[in-house]
Amino acid sequence: MITSNTQTDSHPYPKIRPEHLGPNSPAGKVARMTVGDNNADEFAGLDVNDPIFDADSPTLSDQFPAPYGQAHNPSSDRAGTSPGSFANKPNIGGPRMFSSPDTPGMPAPSAKTAWDFLPDGWTTEETDSHATGCLGHNIGLTAEEYLAGKLATTYIRAVPNDPNFKPVTQLESARLGIVTPEMRRVAEREPHLTPEQVRDEIAAGRLIIPANRKHLAKNLDPMCIGRASKTKINANMGASPVSSGTEEEVEKLRWAEQWGGDTVMDLSTGGDLDATRAAILEHSTVPIGTVPIYSMIIGRKLEDLNEEIIMDTLRHQAEQGVDYFTIHAGVRKGHLKFVKNRLIGIVSRGGSLLAKWMLVHNRENIMYDMWEDICDLMREYDVSFSIGDGLRPGGLADATDEAQLLELATIGELTERAWRRGVQVMVEGPGHVPLDQIEYNMKLQRTLCHGAPFYILGPLVTDVFPGYDHIT
């Protein structure tokens, strides 16, 4: 039997060095890694001799080993429980809220929250009432106390460095201790939460309200996504160059809302994308998300994509009222080397488009380089991020490999940077993942992304049922 700390040749988890995680953030060095100029490799600009590709170095899976063999049944040491009732106490405000006990050896939650990533120059102050300040759940506690589930009792609020600062986003309002009308509406729809708890979870970065100010002015009914809330279901739809149109997409929206879809993504790649998107937003009562790069390349070559096109497209869609953008900024030039070892390669359309752009231009991901500018634009409208996982596995054989987890570490850094700009964040996740790797993936994201909501595209535990992803 393999014990929980044994490494074997068949170890399914990736070899990523622990220094990829810091010093200043869990994502740190991997998100800022550089590569050489050896053009001999088919991935132009990658130096195959760079130490970052040394498979014998200590790895991320050494720091966060997955348990094997002696995985333990939580019911054996939790008095009064029976199989199927292993839940931890549902305390609002801790990193393990509404969870089951961790399998021994899993990555621990992050001791940091969005409170640790305030804008430069901001401070915090104590308040005397929950009506005017948040429970800063990891404020005033040691990391050990916080991770053990102890809750703070001090009410705090953020103090901007500009005395005339006016909050624009739900995150900024929450940091200032403000309960917005949208938070009150969310609490009505989540009866186990109070408006103050909704605010506190948003301030911690564990909850988002995807609600573009332009869409709120129409008929959007605010909802929330995050661990403290009920599980939400997204419905994908979209017109293609050969099928569907505006009327059909609006009809799909009606069906999605009727049968309980909490959010809808318009993934149209053909037809009149602009008119279709406008019609959907005009009729939708649920948040609408898009993948803006799909529109950016309509009518032009991918290699012509530049900063002006990106910003113009994002602003136009934000003006229309799109509530969240999926942006694949976590796919970095240095990650492409690891895709060569995959059985299937890159299956994300947005990820593959940006990978090709990087290879053509022999430079870093343009979305990564523009991150702060993109954040500032999204803040104006309170558009939320759904940070895309462009290197998600397209089959079980590629699950939890170097490429996937290097990108996840980068996404952790992008989450921190977005929080510093006052923008709400959720994180996209895989994808095709074997059943025994799901918990490891979930817990590692919780660590690297500090509890930001995880918007998983599945996970799909089999590759042999194409066309039925809603079942698998």
Which residues make up each language-model segment?
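Alpha/beta enzyme core
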Residues: 2-146, 161, 169, 173, ...
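A ubiquitous short alpha-helical element
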Residues: 153-154, 168
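Histidine/acidic-rich helix-loop-helix segments that form or flank divalent-metal centers
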Residues: 467
